[in-house]
């Protein structure tokens, strides 16, 4: 996220240092004047004399005094993303995440904790969003005293960042939104923030360029003439870019065939 005027937000930096290793950790908290929004990220700096391996670098850790929440996640699969799954928090750990190299359609990097009585338009709700498109983990841990710890950030599985002397590592930003006006109040707060203070530049307030992908129209069965026909129709609809999908390389005509880097001459007859 970002601001265009200083009065839109304030940031607190809490600086911690390990005198033994020389590692410096800066915890960055930003509060937006819009209300109900706090962002958190962390910056690791190696001020020591030897290489350090970062194995876990979460963006957010938040402790809550009780476990009286319903956990909401947004899971799915290809072509059926973001189905709402709910369960009550209980002692132990529950989490969702991705180690696919992207945020994926299986588990969105976004969770909600709502009070059991919260509805669409009333009640206390907290939303947690990670602004990151890679491996992630969203986790809630309830201890024996029924207190809850939420952690959000890069998935530590397979994570190993080499930090040489003098180098820094900045985690992606986690955004927390609180609403006492139910799920809709939380959603509207996220919408207002992300529409104006996430993507910046020329395209922020304009319709984005449109592309056309041939995959669903042709799968592996296409010729040059058929592709040109599809592209021509797409142009009539205002499409500005045509993307040629799977099947154009080697002898790949189904999902069981391997591919290569050479275009298939047969496909273009």
List the model feature ranges, each with a label.
Residues 203-269:
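Aromatic-lined carbohydrate-binding/catalytic grooves of carbohydrate-active enzymes
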Residues 146-164:
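Short acidic, Pro/Gly- and aromatic-enriched capping/linker segments at domain boundaries
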Residues 177-209:
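Terminal connector regions
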Residues 161-180:
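Short Pro-Gly-centered flexible turn/kink motifs
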Residues 1-143, 157-159:
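Polysaccharide-binding surfaces and accessory modules of carbohydrate-active proteins
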Residues 47, 174, 247:
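Flexible loop residues that form catalytic
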Residues 141-146, 218:
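Primarily single-stranded nucleic-acid-binding OB-fold modules
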């Amino acid at each position: 996220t970002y601001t265009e005027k200083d009065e839109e937000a304030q940031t607190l930096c809490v600086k911690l240092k390990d005198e033994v290793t020389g590692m410096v950790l800066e915890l960055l908290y930003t509060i937006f004047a819009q209300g109900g929004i706090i962002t958190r990220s962390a910056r690791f700096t190696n001020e020591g004399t030897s290489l350090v391996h970062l194995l876990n670098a979460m963006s957010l850790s938040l402790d809550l005094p009780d476990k009286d929440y319903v956990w909401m996640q947004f899971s799915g699969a290809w072509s059926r993303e973001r189905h709402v799954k709910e369960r009550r928090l209980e002692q132990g750990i529950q989490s969702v995440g991705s180690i696919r190299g992207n945020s994926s359609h299986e588990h969105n990097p976004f969770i909600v904790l709502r009070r059991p009585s919260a509805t669409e338009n009333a009640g206390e709700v907290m939303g947690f969003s990670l602004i990151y498109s890679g491996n992630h983990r969203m986790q809630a841990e309830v201890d024996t005293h029924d207190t809850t710890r939420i952690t959000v950030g890069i998935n530590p599985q397979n994570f190993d960042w080499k930090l040489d002397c003098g180098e820094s590592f900045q985690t992606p930003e986690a955004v927390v939104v609180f609403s006492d006006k139910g799920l809709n109040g939380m959603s509207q707060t996220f919408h207002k923030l992300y529409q104006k203070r996430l993507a910046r530049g020329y395209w922020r307030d304009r319709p984005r360029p449109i592309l056309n992908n041939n995959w669903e129209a042709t799968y592996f069965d296409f010729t040059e003439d058929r592709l040109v026909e599809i592209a021509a129709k797409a142009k009539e609809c205002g499409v500005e870019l045509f993307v040629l999908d799977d099947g154009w390389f080697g002898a790949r005509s189904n999902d069981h065939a391997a591919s290569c880097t050479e275009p298939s001459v047969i496909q273009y007859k």
